[in-house]
Amino acid sequence: MKNKYPHIFEPITVRRMTVKNRIVMTPMGTNYGEQNGEMSFLHINYYEQRAKGGTGLIIVENASVDSPQGSNGTTQLRIDLDNYIPRLFKLCESVHKHGACIAIQLNHAGASAMSSRIGMQPVSASDVPSKAGGEIPRPLEKDEIMHIVKKYGEAAKRAQNCGFDAVEIHAGHSYLISQFLSPITNKRTDEFGGSAENRARFAKLVIEEVRKQVGPFFPIFVRISADELMEGGNTLEDTLEYLKYFEKEVDVFDVSCGLNGSIQYQIDANYLPDGWRSFMAKAVKEKYNKPCITVGNIRDPQVAEDILAGGDADFIGMGRGLIADPEWVNKVEFGNVCDIRKCISCNIGCAGHRIGLNQPIRCTVNPAVNSGEDYMKTKVNKPCNVVVIGGGTAGLEAACTAAEVGCTTFLIEKKAELGGLASVISKIPDKKRLADFPNYMIHRASKLHNLFVFKNTAATVDMVKALNPDIIVNATGSVPTLPPITGLHDLVDKDGTNVATVLKMIERINEYPEDMNGQKIAIIGGGAVGLDVMEFFTERGAEVTMVEMLPMIGNGLDPVTKCDTNAKMAKYGVKQMTNTALQEVKNDRFIVKNPEGEIEEIPFDYGFICLGMRANTPVLSEIDEAFSNTNVEIVNIGDSKRARRIIEGTEEGRNILNVLARHDYL
C-alpha cells in the first residue's frame, strides 16, 4: 500500500550519515541522567524507546562541554571527560540496533547556569543576565573564550569516539554561544562584540574547532534562535546576516527561535499552530542552501508532510511529540494515525517538572514515558471485572488500561459524551489543542471489545452491584469551588445574571461578541482557569481586572505558561489586584478587601468566579458502605480524589495496574 506521507519517509544523506526518514527527535532535557553527569540506564531506555518507535534521527539533549562552569542542570549530561564514554557508547549501540541515527548536542550554559548548582559565578559574553531577574554573570576573558573553544572540539571528538553519527552545537536559547550572538546579552567592545561579525566570532571559532577535530566526513548541526522574539534581540533578518560568518562548516541548521525571556515561543505555548515556525527554516534554507530542521508544535503528520513537500524544511523536529508518543513514526508509517497520542503542549510534565521543579520529566498524556506500551504484553491470569465510574480522562485511562490487560471493564458516565473537564475546557479557542487527549482516549476505548461504556447513566449502588465488580474505580471529577460569600450562591450561573463560573462561561461561549471593546470583565481567582478566562476576553478587546488572594497571579504555573500569560497581561493592560479578597458579590460588581484592609468595588459587565475546583464524589460514600464487608477494592482517582491537573489523573488511572497486581491478577 502506498504511504500517504512519502516525503516523511524519504531517506536523506548528510555527508556519510544516511537517515531513514525525516523525523528528528530534537534535544530536550529530561533530568534522567545521573548526578555525576553520566547516562543512567533509565535514560538509555528512554532514547531507545523512541528509536524503536521509528524515529530517523535522535539528537540527545545538551551535554556539557566544560563542567561545572558550563552545566545548567543537576543531572545534565557531561561529555567533557573520557569517563562518560562507556555509557554514551551503550546509548549509541541501543539506538543503532533499531536503525536510527543518533547525534548529541554540545553546549555551554554560560549565564543560564546557576551558582547554587555549579558553585561559582556564571560566565557570559557580558555582565548581563540571561533572563530578567537572573544572576549577573562574569564576562569571559579572551583566554577563557579560547579554552572553551577547545573544550567544544574535544567534546565533539569524544562524541565521535562514542559512536554518535553527528554532533549538534547549541547556538540558541540563551546559552553561551547565543549570549555572544545576541545584542541583548553581548555588550562587549572587543573583537567578540559590537558588529554582527564580531558577535558571531565565538560561534565561528567553535564550529571551526569542531570541524578540525571530527574531520571532513562527520556531520555538524547547529541549533539557532532564528528570531529571538524580544525587543532589542536578533530578528530573522539579523540572523540571516550573521549566519554567513560561520555557515561554511555547518551541514544542517536546526532552526528554532526564542530566548529565556520569550520561552513561550522556544517551547511552544499550546495555542500556537502546528508548524508555525517553518517559515524561519525556509528562509535559512533558501539563503544558504543548507538542509534545515524545522520545529514548533508539529503533531499532525499531514502538516509535517506538507512542510517537507513544499520545501520549507528537510527535517521535521519533534521533542514533546515523541515524549507523548514514542511510536509516532511507526503509527504514521503503518497507517495508524488515529492511534497517535498527540502532545497537547501543556508544558506541565516536561518543562514544568524539569525547568520549574528540577524533577525528571513526566507527561500529561503519557503516564509511562519510559516503558511505553509494554504493559499490554502481560494479561490478567484470572477473570476480573472492573467498574469505572466517570468518563473523564482519568476514568478513561483506568478503563482502557484495565481492558487492555484483559479485564472485563464497565465505564459509567452520567453525561452524553466522554472526556470530562478536558473536553469542556478545550472549547475555549486558545485551548482547542487540549481536545486531542480526550479524543484519543475515546478512540482508544472504542477499539476495546471488552470495555462496555454506559453514557447518559448515573451510577447507583444497585447498578454497580449488578456488574459483579472485583475492583471499583471512582473518577467522578470535580466541580467549581464556591465559598460561602455573600451574594455568590444567589447569582453565580443563574439565568439572567452576569456572574458565572468558567463552566457556565464555556456553555455561553458563542454568546460573547467578537468585539468587546469598552466592556469590563472582572475575574476572581488568578490561577490557570482565571487566566484562561482572561485570555479569552482580552483578545476580544475587553478591559480585564484580575483579583487574587495570593501575592502573585499564576502561582504554580509551568514556566512557559507563566511567561506567556505575563506577556499577555502586559500587552493588554490587565489590572492585577493581588493580596485581595472577595467579600461580596453583586450582579454588576465585586466587593473586595485590598491589601490595606480597605473595601473597594470592582464594577463589571461580566464577572467570573475562578476559585479552582473541588472534588466531586456524588456516589462514593454509598459505594464504600455497600461494599464495606467484601473483598472488592475501591479506589478514588483524579479530581474526585483531589482537584489537580490532568497529569495526576492520567497517572492514577494507569495505576490500575498496581491495584490488579496487588490482588494477584497480574
Question: What residues fall within each predicted segment?
Answer:
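Glycine-rich dinucleotide-binding loop and its adjacent helix/turn
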Residues: 366-379, 447, 453, 481-540, ...
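A Rossmann-like FAD-binding core segment of flavoenzymes
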Residues: 435-481, 490, 495-519, 539-625
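Beta1-alpha1 glycine-rich phosphate/pyrophosphate-binding loop at the start
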Residues: 388-452, 456, 481, 526-560, ...
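Flavin-dependent oxidoreductase catalytic cores
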Residues: 1-389, 393, 397-404, 408-409, ...
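Short amphipathic alpha-helical segments
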Residues: 37, 71, 305-306, 329-330, ...
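A conserved FAD-binding loop/helix module that cradles the flavin
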Residues: 533, 557-558, 637-666
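A short helix->loop->beta-strand "cap" motif at the edges of active sites that frequently abuts
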Residues: 100, 218, 290, 469, ...
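Short acidic active-site motifs
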Residues: 303, 459-463, 645
